[in-house]
C-alpha cells in the first residue's frame, strides 16, 4: 500500500540515522583520544619538570611519589574543567534550542588515566 514509497523512505531515514550515529560516535572517540594525548603531554611537561630536576637512570622514591601526586592532581583538575566546560556547552545548547548533551559525551570528556 505504499504508493508514495513511505516504507522505503523509512528505511532510508533509518539508514541515514545509523550513519549519523556512527559518525558521531567516531568523532567522540577521536575527541577522547585527542584529549588523552593532550592530557598526557601536559602531565609530562608540568609534572616531569616539577618532580625531576636532575634526570638520572632511575626514579628515587621521592620523585616517584611526587610524579604520582602531581599526575593525580592534574588529572583531577582536568576532569573538573572538562565537566564545567561540558555543562556550559549543554546550557548554551539548551538556550539555543539544541537540546542537552547525552551522558556518553559527558563521560567521554573525562579522563580516567
UniProtKB/Swiss-Prot annotation:
A Pfam family per the record: zf-Tim10_DDP
Organism: Aspergillus fumigatus (strain ATCC MYA-4609 / CBS 101355 / FGSC A1100 / Af293) (Neosartorya fumigata)
Task of the protein: Mitochondrial intermembrane chaperone that participates in the import and insertion of some multi-pass transmembrane proteins into the mitochondrial inner membrane. Also required for the transfer of beta-barrel precursors from the TOM complex to the sorting and assembly machinery (SAM complex) of the outer membrane. Acts as a chaperone-like protein that protects the hydrophobic precursors from aggregation and guide them through the mitochondrial intermembrane space.
The keyword Zinc appears for this protein: yes
Protein name (Swiss-Prot/TrEMBL): Mitochondrial import inner membrane translocase subunit tim13
CC terms in the record's Gene Ontology section: mitochondrial inner membrane; mitochondrial intermembrane space protein transporter complex
Renumbered ranges of motif Twin CX3C motif: 47-70
Keyword terms: Chaperone, Disulfide bond, Membrane, Metal-binding, Mitochondrion, Mitochondrion inner membrane, Protein transport, Translocation, Transport, Zinc
Chief site of localization: mitochondrion
Complex and partners: Heterohexamer; composed of 3 copies of TIM8 and 3 copies of TIM13, named soluble 70 kDa complex. Associates with the TIM22 complex, whose core is composed of TIM22 and TIM54. Interacts with the transmembrane regions of multi-pass transmembrane proteins in transit.
Cellular compartments annotated: Mitochondrion inner membrane
Comment field on protein domains: The twin CX3C motif contains 4 conserved Cys residues that form 2 disulfide bonds in the mitochondrial intermembrane space. However, during the transit of TIM13 from cytoplasm into mitochondrion, the Cys residues probably coordinate zinc, thereby preventing folding and allowing its transfer across mitochondrial outer membrane.
An example Gene Ontology molecular-function term: metal ion binding
Membrane topology: Peripheral membrane protein
Disulphide bond pairs: 47-70, 51-66
One BP annotation, GO: protein insertion into mitochondrial inner membrane
Xref: InterPro entries: Tim10-like, Tim10-like_dom_sf
Family (UniProt): Belongs to the small Tim family.
SUPFAM superfamilies for this protein: Tim10-like
Gene3D superfamilies, per the entry: Mitochondrial import inner membrane translocase subunit tim13 like domains
Amino acid at each position: 500500500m505504499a504508493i508514495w514509497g513511505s516504507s522505503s523512505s523509512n528505511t532510508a531515514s533509518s539508514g541515514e540515522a545509523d550513519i549519523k550515529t556512527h559518525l558521531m560516535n567516531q568523532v567522540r572517540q577521536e575527541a577522547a583520544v585527542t584529549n588523552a594525548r593532550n592530557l598526557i603531554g601536559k602531565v609530562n611537561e608540568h609534572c616531569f619538570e616539577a618532580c625531576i630536576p636532575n634526570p638520572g637512570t632511575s626514579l628515587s622514591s621521592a620523585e616517584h611519589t611526587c610524579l604520582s601526586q602531581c599526575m593525580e592532581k592534574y588529572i583531577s583538575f582536568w576532569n573538573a574543567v572538562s565537566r564545567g566546560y561540558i555543562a556550559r556547552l549543554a546550557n548554551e545548547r539548551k538556550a539555543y534550542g539544541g537540546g542537552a548533551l547525552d551522558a556518553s559525551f559527558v563521560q567521554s570528556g573525562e579522563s580516567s588515566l
